[in-house]
Each structure stands twice: as C-alpha cells, then as structure tokens.
C-alpha cells in the first residue's frame, strides 16, 4: 500500500487571498502532493489548508509553505479571534494509509528540525510528536498566544523543541505535530427535536451526560468536590457529539467528531447511534460525511456490514465501497460520490490512461496495434488476473451456496486472497508497459560525451532490472493464485470445477509468458550474478506451476468424469 500522509497547516491570514495564493502555490509546485482544500476564515483571520501526498514530498511542501508564510505574513500586525502564536500557527501531519503513527511522528520531527534550523523559527512539537506529556496539548504550547510569546521564550521551561529561544516579532512560533485523522460525521434522524438528538449524542459520546439531581433533564447538575460537573460516560471512546437542527434539510442530526478511527470507526459510531435512536423511539435515516475520509475507513465499514450479513468479503473494492455507502445511508441527503470524498481517489491522476481502465475490446485493439506496448508482459499479467478471478468467483459462489451456510467464512477467506492477487496482477499490467517505456527512454538518452555514455548505460541497466522484476512479480502472484484454484477444485462448488480448471490454465500461461519476458530482458543485464540468480528462481517457479497445473487438471477431469 502506498504511504500517504495529510498535512493541515493553519496560517494566520484569512482576509487577503493573494497572500494565501502565494503560500498554496508553493505547495502545488511540489511533485507528489495534491492540494485538497483551502478554507479562509475572515473573522478569525486564519486559513486552514489541506494537502495530501507521500511523506517526503508532504514535508517538503510543508516546509516551503512555512518558509513563504514567514516571508509574507507579519504577525506584529495580525488581529483575529482564533488563538494563535505564529504566521504558520500549527502544522499537523496525519497518517492516511500505509504508514504508522510512529513513522509519521518521525516525519514531524524531521520537518520541525528543518524549520527551526533553516528558518530560525521556534518550534514546539505537540500531540503524538510531543517530547513531554505537558506539550502534547496544543493549548499548553500556545498559552499566552503571540502577545505573550516574547516572555514565554525567556522561560527555560518553555525552551522550544527546535529552533532558537529568540522572539521574532514577524514570524512568531509554530507548533508541529502528528495526530490521528479527524472525521466530521453527522447521523440523520427522523425528527426535528434537538432535545432528542442531544439525548442520542449524550448516549454515545465519550464525555457522556451530566448527572442531575432529581429530574434527569431539568434537575440541578451534580458537582464533585472540586466543583466540576459529574458525568456518566457514553458508550464510545474518542467520540464527541451534540444534537442540532439543520434547517436546510428540515431534520435533526447527531453531529459527531471521531478523533481516533482505530478506537471508534465510522460504522461503530453509526451502529451505536442507531441503537440509541431506536431505544428512544427514533429512527436513523442515513448519515452525512463532512469533508474527506480515508479509503481504509470506508472499506472497514463495508466489510463490517458484509460480515453482519454473513456474506463473502472477497469482492471488488468498488463493491465494498458501494456496500458501505448504502449501509451507512450516505446518499440520504445528497448524492455521495466516492471519487470526491475518499482521499485516495482524489489523489488518482485522472489524466493517466491506464490499460486496465480500457474496455476488453479497447485493450485487445491496443495490443494488436503497431505500438510495441502493451506486449507479452502486460498480457501475461492480465491473463493471470483473469485466472485468479475465476478462482475467486468459485470461492464466492461456494460461500453463498445453499446448504453451505456454515462454510461462508472459509470460502470468504479464499475469495479475499484471490481479490488481493487479482488487484496486484492488474497493477502489473500497467507497470510492465511503464517498465518497457523506461527502457526506450533510457536508450534515447544522449551519448556524445563519456559522462553521458556512462549515465546512459546506468539508466539502461536500472530500467532493464525493473523490466525483469515486474514480470517476475507476475510469476510469483500467478503461482500463489494456483493454490486458491486447486483448493476450489478440491473443496469448492462442484458445479464450477471447470471454471477453476480454466483459471489454472490461465495462471500457468501467465507464469510461462512472464518468464519469457524475464529471460529476454535478462540478456541485456551486465550483472551476471543477479542474472543467473533471477533465471534460476524463475525456472523453479515455472516448474512448480507446470506440476500444479497437471495436478489441478487431473482433479478437474476426475470430477467431470464422475458426473
């Protein structure tokens, strides 16, 4: 899975779009990141910017944005309602996919160190990036705000984590942190009553509801020995919620903020709201996602509802997303477009023409054209994807077969493995063509000087190695798929045994076809040790595939004969 992090810097300027545009231009200049949102606040005189990308590129874009803000925002002239202590006030990093919080913290520290060292701005690390418990809370770091910063920096206790303990009236200070993804999520109710919506909110939110003396609604709030209100905790951790009425929709909602999806996922919050609403004579009609959501959160929701139905989880990503959207009622108030609401989908390059997005006819015509790519490598990967798809189909049919209800999880597991291999092989369809194009590009490099010749040779060798590794991965994935195909012949729906057999033929063809590509590309490799090793491993994989193919076809023919 590709590593993605989100960055949400807050800049102390919300009235002059020309200033903000200069900052966001720096972000958009960085290859590998995508600017998702720019939210200007005039009253607060503050702008929240959201962008996403691969880790190194994100912290590069963040640094350039902070640098530009330091040049063009003068904090000595800033006025606004929101608490702040710097031109770039806060800059949190948020893990989205393929990366842990611990890894994200390291990137936050890397960014903080560079900002302090190169820009000479005092940096405080907060949330998960904090070095002390006291500094975990952003409010503690920002206490005193800009107006009290000069005095704060004189206090050794508040020495910055990075950068000088010197007050710069123009830039102020900055808080850089790492936090979990925040989800703003509203659950729709079939009522206009804010009081009833609040009752549901108090049932589920972490904070819960205040204890009252006498009447549970109007009674005096009970307080502890310190004079603080006493609360009965709600059912969900890392969840904030309140009830409100939305005039635009004419309904009451439970407005929810989920602060840690690993503790309380979206689908759990939805289900808990449904339970509370039903208990109070209300009905949840659907829900609304405010802002963006990681693909993982939507996939987990879809998989949860499939498990609840005792249905196979081994279906396509698109189908799982569709199940999640339908089950959560995300289309209740307005159409929900996954391409616009799921972060990973927003990052996809819509301009790139992928082979796997073509129709069958289009792909076939492209292969038959005078262009040398797609060639045997891409076709082998595609044939492999078709082969494992047949095995996955048999697993799904078996999972839903009448009388086999107690075996649905067994076949669902096989189908999930098949879907993963299918997706990997489909990626390799385009990767193989890209690898071929890289070789062509390398051969086209200039070779007039000795230095250019050396650089060209190195580029050709690197591209050739990639062009070997891609079809080799096709071989590995296709061979792994044959385990699924054999299992489906042995234990799957007997009515689909020939489908699994055809899948085995496809898988073995994919392996032999990909190995031809490995062998032909290996002839141009200078690294003899690597060449011999990869050819030896490839031969071993092909031999295993041939044996497995014979075993599977023997079983298929035996089962056909018995009918």
Question: Can you describe what each PLM-predicted range is?
Answer:
Residues 1-362, 369, 447, 455, ...:
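Long, contiguous binding/interaction regions
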Residues 5-9, 356, 360, 372-379, ...:
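Disorder-to-helix initiation segments
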Residues 7-9, 85-92, 260, 367-394, ...:
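Conserved phosphate/anionic-ligand binding catalytic regions in large, soluble enzymes, centered on
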Residues 65, 363, 389-393, 435, ...:
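Amphipathic, well-ordered alpha-helical segments in soluble domains
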Residues 111, 121-125, 134-137, 481, ...:
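Preference for long, well-ordered alpha-helical segments
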Residues 181-183, 432-505, 509, 521:
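Amphipathic alpha-helical interface segments
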Residues 382-383, 414, 421-428, 467-477, ...:
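Amphipathic alpha-helix face/heptad-repeat signature
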Residues 400-446, 541-550:
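A structural-propensity feature for long, helix-poor, extended segments
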């Amino acid at each position: 899975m590709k590593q993605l992090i989100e960055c949400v810097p807050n800049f102390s300027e919300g009235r002059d779009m020309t200033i903000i545009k200069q900052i966001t231009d720096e972000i958009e200049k960085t290859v590998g990141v995508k600017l998702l949102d720019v939210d200007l606040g005039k009253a607060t005189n503050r702008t929240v910017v959201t962008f996403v990308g691969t880790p190194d590129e994100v912290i590069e874009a963040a640094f350039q944005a902070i640098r530009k803000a330091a040049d063009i925002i003068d904090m000595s002239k800033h006025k606004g309602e929101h608490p702040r202590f710097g031109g770039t006030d806060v800059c949190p990093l948020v893990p989205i996919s393929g990366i842990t919080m611990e890894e994200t913290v390291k990137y936050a520290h890397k960014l903080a160190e560079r900002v302090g060292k190169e820009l000479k701005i005092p940096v405080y690390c907060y949330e998960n990036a904090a070095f002390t418990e006291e500094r975990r809370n952003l409010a503690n770091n920002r206490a005193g705000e800009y107006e009290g910063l000069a005095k704060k920096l004189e206090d050794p206790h508040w020495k910055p984590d990075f950068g000088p303990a010197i007050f710069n009236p123009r830039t102020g200070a900055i808080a850089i942190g790492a936090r979990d993804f925040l989800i703003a999520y509203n659950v729709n109710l079939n009522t206009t009553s804010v009081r009833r919506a609040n009752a549901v909110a108090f049932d589920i939110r972490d904070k819960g509801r205040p204890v009252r003396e006498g009447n549970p609604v109007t009674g005096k709030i009970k307080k502890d020995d310190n004079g603080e209100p006493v609360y009965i905790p709600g059912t969900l951790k890392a969840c904030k919620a309140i009830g409100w009425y939305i005039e635009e929709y004419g309904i009451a909602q439970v407005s929810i903020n989920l602060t840690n999806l690993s503790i309380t996922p979206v689908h759990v919050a939805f289900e808990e709201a449904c339970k509370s609403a039903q208990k109070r004579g209300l009905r949840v009609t659907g829900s609304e996602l405010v802002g963006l959501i990681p693909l993982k959160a939507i996939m987990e929701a879809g998989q949860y509802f499939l498990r609840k139905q005792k249905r196979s989880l081994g279906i396509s990503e698109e189908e799982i997303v569709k199940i999640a959207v339908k089950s959560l009622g995300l289309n209740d108030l307005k159409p929900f477009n996954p391409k616009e609401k799921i972060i990973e989908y927003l990052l996809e390059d819509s301009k790139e023409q992928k082979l796997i997005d073509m129709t069958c006819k289009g792909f076939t015509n492209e292969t038959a054209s005078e262009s040398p790519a797609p060639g045997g490598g891409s076709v082998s990967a595609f044939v492999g994807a078709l082969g494992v798809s047949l095995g996955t189909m048999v697993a799904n049919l078996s999972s839903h077969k009448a009388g086999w209800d107690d075996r649905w999880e067994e076949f669902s597991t096989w189908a999930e493995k098949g879907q993963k291999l299918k997706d990997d092989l489909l990626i390799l369809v385009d990767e193989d063509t890209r690898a071929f194009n890289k070789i062509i590009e390398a051969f086209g490099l200039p070779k007039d000087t000795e230095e250019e010749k050396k650089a060209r040779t190195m580029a050709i060798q690197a591209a050739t190695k990639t062009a070997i590794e891609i079809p080799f991965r096709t071989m590995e994935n296709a061979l792994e798929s044959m385990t699924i195909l054999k299992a489906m012949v042995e234990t799957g729906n007997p009515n689909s045994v020939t489908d699994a057999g055809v899948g085995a033929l496809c898988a073995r063809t994919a392996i032999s076809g990909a190995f031809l590509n490995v062998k032909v590309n290996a002839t141009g490799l200078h690294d003899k040790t690597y060449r011999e090793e990869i050819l030896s491993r490839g031969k071993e994989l092909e031999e295993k595939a041939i044996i497995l193919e014979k075993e599977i076809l023997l079983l298929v023919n035996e089962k056909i004969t018995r009918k």
